[in-house]
Every structure is written in C-alpha cells, then in structure tokens.
C-alpha cells in the first residue's frame, strides 16, 4: 500500500504545529500513540490509511483520497471551500475522524481493553452492557455470558404475572434506565392492528414464562429493616461498583456502572423474601450468576432490602394489561406459523386439535423465538446452542453500502456510519412507507440510546472489518500477553473493572473516592508482581480482610477453579513474573537488624500500620501478613517509591524515589538507601505471621 497523505499533511509527524489548521497540524498524541518516530505506530511503518481509511495513493485534489466529513455541517463547509462531493464507487472511503479509534480493532483483535483508546473501550463496554453480542454473532466475543437474568424461576422473584406483561410491553415505563429494550409501539407496529397482535404475543409470552417457571423457595425471610442504614450500606460496601441505585448520594450517583441492573422501584417488582435471600446468597437462586456475596449479616441484608423496597412505581404496579384476545391469538398462529408449510385449511385443522392452553403456550413459545428473548435470558424450552436472532456483525464495517436497506428514508445519507447510527437510534424506521405483512416487520428493538452512546458503538462496529492486515502489522500476542488477556476476560466478566482501576483502565467506583482514594477500592497496578501467586489464589477462593478499617468490601465471587486460575495467572503474566513465589530466607548482616529497628522506630511505621503493634485504629494494611502475601522485590520497590505504583497513596516516599538519603535522616548502613530499604523489608517479613487471617464464611 502506498500513502501519499504527507504531500499535504507536511507537519503531521513534527512537534510544534499543534495549533495550526489542517493540513499543517501535528497529529494528536504524536509522541506516544501514532505517527511520531518514537510513538507506538510510526508513520513510516504504519502509514495513514491503515487507521483512517481512504485512498492514500490519490492526492491530485481534495476529493481524490475520499475524505469523509464528520457531519452535514462539515460537508457543506467542504463543498464551499474545496468543492467536496460524496465519494463514489470507493469501497473504503476515509473514516470520519470521530470514528477513527475503532480501526484499532483491525490489528488488536485479541485484546480485551486497549490503553490510550478510551472511546473504543467505552464503545466495547456499551456493546457488552446492552448485550448486542447476544443477538448478533461477533467473532471474539463468544466467551461472554448472556446479558439478561435467567427466567427459569422468575415467578418466585417478581410479584405478579401482570408485572411481567407490562414489563415486556414497556420496560422503560417502569425503569427509565433499563437496558431491556422496547419491542412494541415502535415506528412499524404502533398502528391499532399491530398493537392488538403484539398484545396477544405479550400475553402469550408471559403465560409461557410463568407456566414453565420452576418453584424456588427463598432461604431467608424479610423481617423489615432500617432504610437509612440500608442506603449507607449500599453506598459504602461496593454495590455502586456494578449498579446504579436510585436515591444514593451525588458522589455515588455519578458512578456510571451498568454490569448490574439499575435498581429502582423494586418495591413494586420483587418478592421481599426473594430479595433478602438474593442479597445473602445470590448463587443459591442462580448458580451461574456473576453477582457476588458481600457476606451480609441478617440485619445488613434486611436493611438493604428495606431501602430498595421503599422505592416504588405505584402507577405501574396498578396497571392491568389488556386481556388475551383469543381470536387474534388464533389468527396469528394460523397465518404466521401453522400455515408456513401447510395450506390455510390444514393449519386451521391443526389448530382445532389444540386446547385453549396449548394455543396460548404455542404462541408464547413461537413469539419468544421470534423476538429472540432466549439470546439474553435462560428460558425453559430454549436450552442448547441456539443461533443468534440477528445477523452477524463480525465484518459489518466492510459490508457494501448497497446491502444496507435505506427503505424510503431519503433524509439519511448513504454511508455506513449514518445507516448504523440511524439504526441504533430508531431501528424500525426502515419499514416506514414500505408495505409489509406483520410477520416480516423489522424486529430489532429500541434501546433508546443517547447520541454519545450511539457514536461510541458505531465506532466499534465500523472497526469490525474484513481486512487483510499482514501478520507483521498485527499485534500478535506472545504467551504472556495471551495469558494476561485470558485473565482480563475473567476480570471483565465479573466486572472487576467496576471497582478497580486495572493497569490504568476502569475503576469507576474508585473515582467516587477522589477526595481520599485510600478509602476506596485499590488500583491493581502491577498486581502480579505485588502479590504471591499462591496467596492470590487462596484469597480469591476465601476472601479475608486486608484493610479492616475500610467500609468498602471485597466480595466473594462465584468463580470456578478455572476462572481463578486464569485471573491469577493473567495478573502474573501481565507483570512478567516467571515464578509463583520468591524464596524468603532472612539472613541478617552484622548490625543490620538493629539498624532496621532503628529506622522502623524513626519512621513511626506503626502510627498507620497499627494492627498487632498498638491499640490505635489502623490507617494502613496489616503488615503482619506481608510475608505470606507480598513479593520481596515488590516490597523493596514499594518502600523506595510508593507513588510510582499508586499516585494517590498516603504512604510517604521516605527514600526520595530510592536514590537520595533517608528522611528523616538515620545514619545507619552507610546511608545506603538500598541496604536500608532491604533491612526494613526483612524486618517486616521476620515478624510476619505464618498463617493468613481466618477467611469469612463463604456465604455469610
């Protein structure tokens, strides 16, 4: 491939022209991300069109490279200024600049998250949050679990069949921030005839779900609780790391995590006994859930339940869904299903042999299959490896524009990004003005996405292309990197990123503690170097307290043995640690131990690390367990310069980044910082306890 873009963009790889207009401007992040000679993607190796698309070999005028404007306003400006016109017969015109980041996917197919690609990471997260991968096959996303809750025991969870019907019909009427989309009353089915048929479908689906639901007996009883304390617990123990919760304080309300549902109006939705049981033992109701246990006491669980149950949607709870119209039910069964391979008369004869209940359940089953409910939810009767309901998106960014159905929507510009954007905003609009029978209508539901969400998701979809990148140009993972990515897939599945910033990515909940990050979930920076592998494995199996002074809790997850191994080995590989442990043999040099004690006293280590040493409240982790938990080499690096690992830590850098003298000055060990640090570390390891703290009971 030949790129001649620098014929016009003459200073694109040179620092100092950041404030110039195009085409004389310096490329963003020129020294770190792209173009610059010292960047990750030097222009002489990667060119321009590998990221931006277009025809880089054609530079005879402004239109030749297939420039694509960001929006209609820029298109008009270009028309006036450069005589721009829409590229014709060019399979891959330039990607609008707001979507460029999505092109990283072409070369970085195996990586879960990319540093310096915030918008791409956000788009990927949105596609996961809204469960697009469940209805549309996307190569590389097959490991993700179903995004919706299991409906196998749903009648033990929700208050009534009427609630199920009204929820299926209009989920946002109950929960405005729900990720459950709207299938009904859209552009192509809001006429009275379609609504009547859709109501018959909803009645039948709800009946099918209710009739096939297994009985579940809650293991706890709701006894009432303290609403104020429940609110405090939700804010402080870590629920906000996965859930948006109505009614919490502002600093927690701004945490925009969507791994779990938005918790609002539960008093109208759920059985109180079920809720307390779920809070105590999520895996008892759903053995495959990613919802962890916070090891709540009975009082804590009841207090949290009291707060959640206090939120109600009275109007929704009093709604009565229109009764099933059996005539319409039978009409749909005959015309849309039973006559598919039979004559109408034969279909009617088949219907006559079915009881009233059988007809309702048959339409329910058929409708669940029609709308693909099984893609997001486990539903009895839909077990097994069923095909996704929607078309595959693996190469959607390369799909010829002629294959996008614009229908009668002449106002939508004929580009990939404009069609995909419009489709995400109003997916049924393509049927408007097009004569279709009921069963052939578009079925893609409406998620009511914001413009910002749409832009981020389009960015990702445009990066899903059928490109032939040479192996030398692809990011090919070595054994360590592959192991790290496998671990991060597990971290993503259980939303570890919601609480923790992992190697610079994620950490929404920790941002709520910006005034004092020491009291939030810790950053997991160089975690595989920090902790010993055996300790980490045991900790994830049996969580025990490390920072006993914190309100926020590390929960107990329902990890499989394989998932724990992938996490532990992933972090170890990410930190390039080749051994499980570092052999700790404490051998003192003459006078070294006395010097270590002198430094320990001078620095007043126990003023923060109080546990086991003083009766003061601790402000830092219990050092008695450092020997079995931390690696020696990491401890040396941490003591020398803690802020290089955690910029927010209150731990002081006593050794001036490990290079200068000790402050306050203690003239021991020849004033050698490395010897002093090593001596302190050995002292900590020597008084370390041989065993870990007693783990919490697994499910209490």
Model-predicted segments: where are they?
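Electrostatic cytochrome c docking/interface patches
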Residues: 1, 29-41, 88-96, 108-127, ...
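Short recognition patches in nucleic-acid-associated and regulatory proteins
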Residues: 16-35
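Short metal-binding segments enriched for Cys and/or His
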Residues: 42-45, 54-62
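Flexible, surface-exposed loop regions and adjacent strand-edge segments
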Residues: 66-68
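Mature N-terminal segment immediately following signal peptide/propeptide cleavage
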Residues: 5-10, 365
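Active-site-adjacent "gating/activation" loops or surface patches in catalytic cores
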Residues: 13-17, 58-60, 387
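Electron-transfer interface patches adjacent to heme c in soluble/periplasmic c-type cytochromes
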Residues: 37, 41, 50, 54-55, ...
């Amino acid at each position: 491939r030949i790129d001649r873009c620098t014929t016009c963009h003459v200073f694109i790889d040179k620092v100092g022209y950041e404030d110039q207009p195009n085409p004389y401007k310096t490329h963003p992040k020129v020294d770190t991300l792209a173009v610059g000679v010292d960047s990750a993607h030097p222009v002489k190796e990667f060119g321009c069109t590998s990221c931006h698309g277009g025809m880089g070999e054609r530079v005879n005028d402004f239109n030749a490279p297939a420039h694509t404007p960001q929006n209609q306003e820029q298109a008009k400006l270009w028309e006036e200024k450069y005589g721009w016109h829409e590229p014709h017969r060019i399979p891959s015109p330039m990607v609008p600049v707001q979507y460029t980041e999505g092109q990283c996917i072409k070369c970085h197919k195996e990586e879960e998250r990319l540093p310096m690609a915030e918008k791409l990471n956000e788009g990927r997260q949105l596609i996961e949050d809204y469960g697009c991968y469940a209805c549309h096959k996307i190569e590389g996303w097959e490991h993700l679990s179903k995004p919706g809750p299991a409906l196998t025991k749903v009648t033990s969870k929700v208050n009534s069949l009427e609630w199920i019907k009204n929820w299926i019909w209009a989920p946002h009427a109950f929960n405005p921030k729900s990720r459950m989309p709207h299938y009904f009353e859209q552009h192509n089915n809001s006429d009275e005839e379609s609504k009547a048929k859709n109501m018959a479908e909803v009645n039948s689906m709800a009946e099918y779900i209710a009739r096939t639901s297994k009985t579940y007996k809650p293991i706890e009883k709701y006894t009432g609780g303290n609403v104020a304390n429940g609110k405090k617990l939700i804010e402080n123990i870590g629920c906000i790391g996965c859930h948006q919760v109505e009614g919490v304080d502002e600093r927690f309300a701004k945490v925009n995590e969507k791994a779990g549902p938005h918790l609002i109006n539960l008093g109208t939705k759920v059985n109180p006994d079920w809720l307390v049981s779920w809070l105590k033992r999520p895996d008892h109701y759903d053995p495959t859930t990613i919802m962890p246990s916070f090891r709540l006491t009975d009082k804590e669980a009841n207090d949290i339940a009291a707060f959640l149950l206090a939120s109600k949607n009275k109007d929704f709870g009093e709604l009565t869904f229109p009764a099933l119209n059996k005539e319409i039910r039978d009409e749909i069964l005959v015309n849309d299903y039973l006559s598919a391979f039979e004559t109408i008369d034969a279909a009617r004869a088949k219907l006559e042999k079915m009881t009233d209940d059988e007809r309702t359940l048959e339409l329910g089953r058929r409708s669940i299959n029609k709308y693909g409910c099984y893609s997001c939810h486990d539903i009895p009767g839909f077990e097994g490896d069923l095909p996704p309901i929607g078309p595959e998106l693996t190469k959607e960014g390369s799909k010829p524009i002629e294959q996008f159905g614009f229908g009668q929507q002449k106002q939508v510009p004929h580009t990939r990004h404009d069609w995909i954007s419009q489709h995400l905003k109003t997916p049924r609009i393509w049927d408007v003005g097009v004569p279709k029978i009921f069963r052939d209508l578009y079925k893609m539901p409406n998620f009511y996405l914001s413009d910002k969400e749409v832009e981020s998701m389009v960015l990702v979809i445009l990066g899903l292309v059928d490109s032939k990148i040479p192996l030398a140009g692809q990011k090919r993972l070595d054994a360590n990197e592959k192991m790290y990515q496998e671990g991060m897939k597990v971290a993503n599945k259980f939303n570890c990123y919601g609480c923790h910033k992992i190697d610079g990515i994620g950490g929404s909940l920790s941002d709520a503690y910006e005034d004092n990050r020491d009291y939030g979930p810790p950053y997991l920076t160089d975690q595989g170097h920090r902790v010993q592998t055996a300790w980490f494995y045991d900790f994830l199996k049996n969580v025990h307290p490390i920072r006993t002074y914190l309100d926020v809790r590390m929960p107990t997850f329902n990890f499989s043995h394989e998932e724990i191994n992938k996490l532990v080995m992933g972090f170890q590989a990410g930190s390039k640690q080749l051994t499980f442990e570092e052999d700790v043999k404490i051998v003192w040099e003459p006078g070294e131990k006395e010097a270590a004690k002198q430094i320990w006293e001078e620095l007043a280590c126990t003023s923060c690390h109080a546990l086991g040493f003083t009766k003061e409240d601790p402000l830092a982790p219990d050092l008695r367990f450092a020997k079995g938990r931390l690696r020696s080499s990491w401890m040396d690096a941490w003591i020398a310069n803690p802020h290089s690992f955690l910029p927010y830590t209150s731990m002081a850098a006593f050794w001036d980044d490990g290079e200068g003298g000790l402050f306050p000055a203690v003239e021991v060990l020849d004033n050698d910082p490395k010897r002093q640090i090593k001596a302190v570390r050995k002292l900590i390891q020597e008084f370390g306890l041989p065993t870990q703290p007693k783990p919490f009971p697994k499910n209490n």
